[in-house]
Amino acid sequence: MTVHYISEQNSILNHFLTQLRDVNIQKDSMRFRKNIERIGEIMAYELSKKLEYKDIAVQTPLGVKHTTTIAEDIVLCSILRAGLALHQGFMNFFDDAENGFVSAY
């Protein structure tokens, strides 16, 4: 298994992580949740670089375009409450993915 540290290079991800860690910003729950969602979007984008793709032909108004699309179905699963904002960030990119949730009773 390969581990990728996406926060090692300076990017907007580091800005959002810094805001999550800031005790003053943590008091703003809406901003906190939005930053978690943004981090989910960044993670989804980075993850998309490692997925398998297949070649397809798409009919456009101007003709046929040969391009690629994700080869396999995606299933997103998160732990209820703690992972909901992060899950939403992934759903913003993988909007046709199946969803699963884990909870404890």
Question: What is the predicted role of each segment?
Answer:
Residues M1-Y105:
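PRPP-associated nucleotide enzymes
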